[in-house]
């Protein structure tokens, strides 16, 4: 109001529009402050703002910088988060200094700069949390590399395997997500500051200097693309939907394993919840939390993709993303932290898992393999023969022995075969079958231990990178504030 408009926003617009934008303030506050400080410094260094007014502007910005995000007086009636900061700045240093904060940039620029800074750090934190989960699974799996278990498909007993091999089934997708977030984080290394409206500015603003002040190694070259690019954020949300799906699969499988019918795993009490009505129950509440996040992450991606269908340079895009991205980053980190804690804290009942493997005929495929390798039957025929043996056992009971298999071969294929008793005994032993896997990545104990070491090493590498990235960002932020204090004479 006071320029192009003759009236302020309606109550309805404040509630539906500015309320949403102001709500993004706390999550973006620190990065918005860094954006404002860098812009003021660039204006002063470029000669666009004299030292006296520049120092006054910086003093006011440093005062705002010292306010904790949730202590700042965000007011939707004032407008978005930048307008709230601008009002507070004006109250502290007056319009003669505060009025220069928007020289050479629209108010959307500090949001774009802030969102990139928040996203880059959040991706590092999410990568670290996911790597902690994969590391926890590898730690659980290694001592159980040779412990017998039954693998399941369609919730039906399938083949003999080991507990360690089953646990690693969850570790690799989670680790890939951690490594994916590390790669995607590189898309936010370019600075979008100093581009003016959308085609540059006549103000003496050095974009490369702004990038340096903000800790970016390069600039996003095209001015309009820099200001409005949304595809990197879609990749972030896609990555979270993928990572959440992997964690949801872990949670769903684990809930089945925790059931009384399976009894393979027991969650730690700290990740469980009692029933308000039935005192005997120990509910795996943490797993429900994880699955809920997966649904939210998928919905977030869908909402963003739908919103981005509007044309280029539309306010819709970041009206959504300014709030959605920080929330998604926080949810990804804390959900992965919970999943890592669940993985590290769960107790595995190896005796029950072995019992399941020995009670179910999980060696059927191995017996078929043995027949094809030691008799005249081809594999497909051997498969049919063993299928007939299983059906006969289900209908009539009894043990599976050489005579029964030979009779089935004659009935199914008209073949006369002699089944080696020693070969059959070995093929019927699930532990022997699980160990007899020569391929890379199999359930062979040495292969499982090697995979555990690989997951542990890659997880540690991601965590080390994340810690270095977070530390580098903090160092850059402190250097920026030190420069601001120097120019402000503080």
Question: Which functions belong to the PLM regions below?
Answer:
Residues 1-187, 197, 205-207, 270-274, ...:
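A helix-coil-helix interface module used to build multimeric assemblies
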Residues 41, 45, 66-70, 91-94, ...:
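Charged/polar positions within long, soluble alpha-helices
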Residues 81-99, 128-131, 160-309:
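Internal glycine-rich alpha/beta core junctions
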């Amino acid at each position: 109001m006071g320029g192009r408009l003759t009236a302020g926003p309606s109550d309805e617009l404040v509630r539906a529009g500015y309320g949403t934008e102001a709500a993004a303030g706390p999550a973006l506050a620190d990065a918005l402050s860094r954006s404002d400080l860098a812009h003021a410094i660039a204006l002063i260094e470029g000669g666009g703002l004299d030292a006296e007014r520049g120092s006054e502007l910086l003093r006011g910005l440093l005062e705002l910088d010292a306010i904790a995000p949730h202590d700042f007086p965000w007011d939707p009636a004032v407008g978005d988060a930048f307008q709230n900061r601008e009002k507070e700045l004006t109250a502290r240093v007056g319009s003669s200094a505060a009025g220069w904060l928007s020289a050479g940039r629209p108010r959307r620029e500090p949001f774009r700069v802030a969102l990139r800074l928040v996203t880059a750090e959040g991706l590092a934190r999410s990568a670290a949390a996911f790597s902690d989960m994969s590391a926890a699974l590898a730690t659980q799996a290694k001592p159980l590399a040779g412990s017998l278990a039954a693998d399941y498909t369609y919730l039906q007993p399938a083949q003999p395997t080991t507990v360690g091999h089953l646990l690693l089934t969850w570790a690799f997708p989670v680790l890939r997500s951690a490594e994916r977030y590390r790669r995607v984080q590189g898309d936010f290394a370019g600075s979008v500051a100093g581009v003016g409206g959308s085609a540059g500015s006549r103000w003496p603003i050095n974009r490369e200097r702004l990038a340096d002040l903000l800790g970016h190694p390069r600039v996003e070259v095209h001015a309009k693309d820099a200001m409005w690019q949304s595809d990197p954020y879609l990749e972030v949300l896609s990555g979270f939907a993928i990572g959440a799906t992997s964690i949801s699969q872990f949670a769903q499988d684990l809930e089945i394993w925790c059931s009384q019918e399976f009894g393979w795993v027991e969650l730690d009490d700290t990740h469980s919840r009692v029933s308000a009505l039935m005192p005997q129950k120990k509910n795996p509440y943490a797993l429900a939390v994880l699955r809920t996040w997966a649904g939210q992450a998928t919905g977030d991606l869908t909402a963003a993709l739908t919103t981005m269908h509007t044309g280029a340079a539309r306010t819709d895009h970041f009206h959504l993303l300014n709030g959605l991205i920080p929330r998604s980053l926080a949810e990804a980190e804390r959900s992965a932290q919970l999943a890592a804690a669940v993985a590290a804290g769960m107790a595995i009942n190896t005796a029950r898992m072995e019992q399941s493997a020995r009670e179910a005929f999980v060696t059927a495929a191995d017996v078929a393999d043995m027949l094809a390798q030691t008799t005249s039957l081809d594999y497909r025929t051997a498969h049919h023969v063993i299928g007939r043996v299983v059906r006969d056992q289900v209908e009539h009971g009894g043990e599976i022995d050489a005579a029964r298999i030979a009779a089935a071969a004659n009935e199914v294929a008209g073949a006369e075969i002699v089944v080696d008793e020693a070969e059959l005994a070995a093929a019927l032993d699930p532990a022997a079958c699980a160990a007899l896997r020569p391929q890379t990545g199999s359930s062979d104990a040495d292969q499982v231990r090697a995979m555990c070491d690989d997951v542990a090493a890659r997880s540690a590498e991601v965590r080390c990178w994340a810690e270095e990235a977070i530390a580098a960002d903090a160092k850059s932020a402190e250097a920026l504030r030190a420069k601001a204090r120097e120019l402000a004479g503080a």
